[in-house]
Amino acid sequence: MGAYLSQPNTVKCSGDGVGASRLPLPYGFSAMQGWRVSMEDAHNCIPELDSETAMFSVYDGHGGEEVALYCAKYLPDIIKDQKAYKEGKLQKALEDAFLAIDAKLTTEEVIKELAQIAGRPTEDEDEKEKVADEDDVDNEEAALLHEEATMTIEELLTRYGQNCHKGAPHSKSGAGTGEEPGSQGLNGEAGPEDPSRETSAEENGPTAKAHTGLSSNSECGTEAGQGGEPGTPTGEAGPSCSSASDKLPRVAKSKFFEDSEDESDEAEEEEEDSEECSEEEDGYSSEEAENEEDEDDTEEAEEDDEEEEMMVPGMEGKEEPGSDSGTTAVVALIRGKQLIVANAGDSRCVVSEAGKALDMSYDHKPEDEVELARIKNAGGKVTMDGRVNGGLNLSRAIGDHFYKRNKNLPPEEQMISALPDIKVLTLTDDHEFMVIACDGIWNVMSSQEVIDFIQSKISQRDENGELRLLSSIVEELLDQCLAPDTSGDGTGCDNMTCIIICFKPRNTAAPQPESGKRKLEEVLSTEGAEENGNSDKKKAKRD
């Protein structure tokens, strides 16, 4: 199924709430994993960020959930800590906060925390495992030395003398034919696989190469990338991945060079003579050869540059949280009658204005004119399918520092920028509610379709006569967007998170039944008639 489950996970995390008396903002939210193998969304519902401000936000993670969860945990406080926030400049505060939390993701302390959130081993843990394995090897060697120290000379000769006699003819034949398992050619290419070499590779597993899943041989690197199990924290290569620099047993190596020493000298002399002859006959100068080599080097360098440009996160072997993962972020602050929305990525905030959808954010896509210009200026490319260097299909996000490595540009001008767009709206009686959601919703339904869907249900009442919970409406929306299977283009197969926030208090209490009202009116009218009748009788008696 690739990135999808065989069956969708439709368990929902939902909730409802309301703000303080000063900000009576009813809200409801729900989140669902859906067809994805993991849940990478996060959100904030904070009706009292301070006594005058409410905050609602959605974070849609990619490459892992760690950056989204980190933002949900720390971004509210980072916003409040900004100087501009304390001065009442909320737009500037949001911009500064987005860039500030993005910068924090590159610090060693935060990278470790992200690794813990993601459940990946940190470098310290890797080092401990490596040291532990080295200690085991040292202990084994010490035990072997101790055993040999207590052995007699006859026992030592028996152990090593017999091995040498048995090994010598075996190694000679292996060197001569090159057919014996474990043989190695002059170019360092490994011969047919040998179980002893596989064991050696496994024992030397906790090294830098094994942890990156790469070997010093490009072919082995390919095997490691294909053969490694997805999601393996250390990215260890399988036994089939062996280094081209692996050494053969010393006995075999020395015997090989003893037998071929004279032959190699003769071969070198013949090679020199042939080179001189070819240069004289063809008129091929060394300068021309150097020029061709320079051209080849230039072409190779250009190809390397192109490959580097088109690299995507994770291709270098070891994934690093915050570099190979990131998140969108759409944050809405409500203070008094002001709604301020900051957005980086393709999550979205939409307001219902007299039943019409009013977009309060702009989806950042690489193919858009402004975004494309920035990406190219930073040295990047956008592929035909709308991906930056063939990888990320977003142009703005928090994290993704793999795309933010141009040292000549400030953070906001990198290929992927964390700088948000800001929109401000003065709320009126026409503004009923707003919706904040990730692209798992917006890829299935348009802004107006979502507003219409909610509008048709927000006044519905349950069997007890009370207004429906907002979270129940969101849950129904998620089910509406969920694809029946994964056979399509991925629409409806993403994680889904959505929040509905009403700008006015909701009268959730059940209305008084009409029959009760009529009975009460009849009683009151009867009593009034009787009083009027009695007064007439009294007047008649007096007359």
Curated annotation (Swiss-Prot):
Mn(2+) 1 binds at residues 60-61. Binds 2 magnesium or manganese ions per subunit. The keyword Phosphoprotein applies. Signal peptide: none annotated. It is found in: Cytoplasm; Membrane. Its EC number is 3.1.3.16. GO terms for cellular component: cytoplasm; membrane; nucleoplasm. Its main location: cytoplasm. It holds the Pfam family PP2C. The modification N6-acetyllysine is found at residue 381. Residues 123-139, 259-310 have a biased composition (Acidic residues). GO terms for biological process: regulation of cell cycle; signal transduction. Residues 26-503 form the PPM-type phosphatase domain. One of its GO terms (molecular function) is metal ion binding. The modification Omega-N-methylarginine is found at residue 22. Coiled coil: none annotated. Transmembrane segments: none annotated. Residues 116-139, 163-326, 508-543 are annotated as: Disordered. InterPro entries: PP2C (IPR015655), PP2C_BS (IPR000222), PPM-type-like_dom_sf (IPR036457), PPM-type_phosphatase-like_dom (IPR001932). Belongs to the PP2C family. This is Protein phosphatase 1G. The lineage of its organism: Eukaryota, Metazoa, Chordata, Craniata, Vertebrata.
